[in-house]
Amino acid sequence: MGLRIALFGQAPFGRDVALRLAEAGHEMVAVHVPPDGGGRADPLAEASEERGWPLFRHKAYRKAGVAMPQRIEEHASHEADLNVLAFTTVILPPEIIDGPRLGSLCFHPSLLPAFRGGNALAWQIIMGAEEAGVTVFRPDEGVDTGPIVVQKGGVPIGAHETSASLYFDHLYPLGVEAMADAVAAVAEGRAEFLPQDEDGASFQGLVDDEVARLDWSLGGTELDRRIRGCDPQPGAWAEYEGEPVRFYGGSLEAGVSHGETPGRVLDPDEEGRMRIAAAGETALRITRVRRAEGKKVSAAESGIPVGGLFV
């Protein structure tokens, strides 16, 4: 049985979820994307326009913490059976979340209840999780706390994984499958809504520049995870001669008897990557850097010499 779906999302993930659901016989009665920022067109918006799906670009659905009446009325007019939240960044009021007769389904890129919050991808790497996965749940009044409908795991987090590779290579395709499975289960009346186990719950805040700042008193393993977890955004960083420098394409080198202060630039490796001394006989290998507000360049082109010190 095809459902009338109101989809809230963005980017290629939102597009692919919408296309997958449409192929399964569901009708997109409303597609909500972020307002047009004047840059590259949103892939979900483009797909909606090509297929004639009703498209909305609202900046907000609440004002001063209260649901905007015009948004509630508009949403009700679509007579959606189900809301599908495909990586949306907007905060929807309960009147919209609970409006459709079948409620809402929301995607999250972790194995809930672990790693709740808006930067789950980064924190899984930063905190050394060994396995990743995705969850589709029914949202409630909490942050990523609602009952689970579909969960898919078994994704190992490799030693060279970044937030970007974890998402695009693994959790993105797995997430599209999970969303399709969850909608099918709801449509067919066989969905189970399993409460989350609070004993295994964790919540992490946003990964901002304070989190991304490298602390050279930490061991190389912790610094390597932070660099990879913050790649590509916001980019782990340290100061060189009073200037912020962000690191990308990082990896850990163990068993290095460098005898140097952590943060000191060592001789580059055979591939030209920057090597930086870290605590515990380790070094960080860096492929690309971005100085201040400049562009990313190869570490060899950074102009930061051997013997330079990051603080």
Where are the predicted features?
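One-carbon transfer enzymes
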Residues: M1-P234, T282, R291-K295, A300, ...
